[in-house]
C-alpha cells in the first residue's frame, strides 16, 4: 500500500517509513493462516458461528453459497463461502441453561468445556435417536432462511442432558456436511478440512465432524489463524516470500490430524438424512411461528 507517514507514526509510536501491507477480512485471512490456498481444501473457522471457505480454480455458482469471489485471496482463484449462524453459540446456550450453576458449585467453570466433552462422549453416535436442528438463529447456508428455527426432536424418557449435548454436537456437524454436500453437488469436492477458532479446542466435536463428513480434519499450531494469515500477507508484501503459497508452506505448521472413524459412517448417514428431511417437514411451522412473533431469531 505504501509507507507509514510521519503523522501516523507519531500517533502510533512507530518509525516513519515502515511498509504498510494490505491484508484482508478476518475469515479470508484465516484461510491463508490455515494454508487453504489450494483446491480441494476447506477452511472451517469455528466460533459462535462457523464459516466454511474454499478456493476454486474456476468459478462455481451454488445456491446458498456465497461467491464465487475472484482474487480475494489469490488473483487467479475464486472463493466459495458457506456458513452456519449458530454452532458454538448453541453449545454456550446449553452450558448457560443446563450446566452453569452445577459447575460453579464445583468450582470447575473454567474447565466446563472439557467436562462437556466428557459428558457427550458417554453417549453413543446417533444420540439414541435424538436429533437437533441447528437453526437457532436462522439458516445461513444452504437455505438462506432467516425464519428457520432450532429443534430438538426424538426425545424419550430415557434421554438425558448428555444426550441433548451429544445431539447438539452432531446436529452442528450435520449442518457442516450439508454445506459440503451442496458444494460437491455443484462441482467443488472438499478432500481435507483445516480448522481454527475456539471450537477447534473440542477434539470430540471435531471427531464428530470428521466422522459425519468422512473427511480428515487438520489442526495447526496457531489457533487464531486470522492473525497468522495477516502476518503471512505482511511477509509476502515486504518480500520475505515470493507468493502466498510459498509463505504458507514455510509458516503454517500442522499440529494434529483427526481421521474419520469408518465404523460410524452408516449410523451418521442415517441420521443425517433425517436431519435434512426435518427442515422441510418443519419449515412451514417454523415460518408461521417466526412471522407471528414478528421477529427473526437474534443474530
Regions found by a protein language model. Give the residues of each.
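Active-site core segments that coordinate phosphate-bearing ligands/cofactors
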Residues: 2-299
Amino acid at each position: 500500500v505504501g509507507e507509514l507517514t510521519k503523522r501516523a507514526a507519531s500517533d502510533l509510536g512507530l518509525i516513519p517509513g515502515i511498509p504498510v501491507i494490505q491484508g484482508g477480512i478476518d475469515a479470508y485471512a484465516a484461510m491463508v493462516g490455515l494454508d487453504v490456498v489450494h483446491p480441494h481444501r476447506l477452511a472451517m473457522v469455528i466460533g459462535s458461528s462457523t464459516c466454511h471457505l474454499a478456493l476454486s480454480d474456476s468459478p462455481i455458482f451454488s445456491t446458498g453459497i456465497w461467491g464465487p469471489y475472484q482474487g480475494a485471496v489469490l488473483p487467479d482463484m475464486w472463493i466459495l463461502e458457506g456458513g452456519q449462524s449458530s454452532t458454538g453459540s448453541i453449545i454456550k446456550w446449553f452450558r448457560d441453561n443446563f450446566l452453569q450453576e452445577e459447575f460453579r458449585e464445583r468450582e470447575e467453570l473454567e474447565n466446563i468445556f472439557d467436562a462437556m466433552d466428557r459428558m457427550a462422549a458417554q453417549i453413543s453416535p446417533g444420540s439414541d435417536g435424538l436429533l437437533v436442528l441447528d437453526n437457532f438463529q436462522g439458516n445461513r447456508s444452504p437455505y438462506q432462511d432467516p425464519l428457520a428455527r432450532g429443534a430438538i426432536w426424538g426425545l424419550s424418557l430415557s434421554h438425558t442432558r448428555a444426550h441433548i449435548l451429544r445431539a447438539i454436537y452432531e446436529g452442528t456437524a450435520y449442518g457442516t456436511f450439508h454445506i459440503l454436500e451442496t458444494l460437491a453437488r455443484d462441482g467443488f469436492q472438499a478432500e481435507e478440512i483445516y480448522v481454527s477458532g475456539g471450537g477447534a479446542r473440542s477434539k470430540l466435536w471435531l471427531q464428530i465432524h470428521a466422522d459425519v463428513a468422512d473427511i480428515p480434519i487438520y489442526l495447526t499450531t496457531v489457533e487464531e489463524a486470522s492473525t497468522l494469515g495477516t502476518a503471512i500477507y505482511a511477509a509476502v508484501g515486504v518480500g520475505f516470500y515470493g507468493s502466498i503459497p510459498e509463505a504458507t508452506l514455510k509458516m503454517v505448521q500442522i499440529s494434529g490430524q483427526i481421521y474419520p472413524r469408518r465404523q460410524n459412517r452408516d449410523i451418521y448417514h442415517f441420521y443425517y438424512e433425517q436431519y435434512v428431511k426435518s427442515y422441510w417437514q418443519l419449515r412451514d411451522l417454523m415460518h408461521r411461528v417466526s412471522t407471528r412473533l414478528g421477529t427473526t431469531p437474534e443474530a
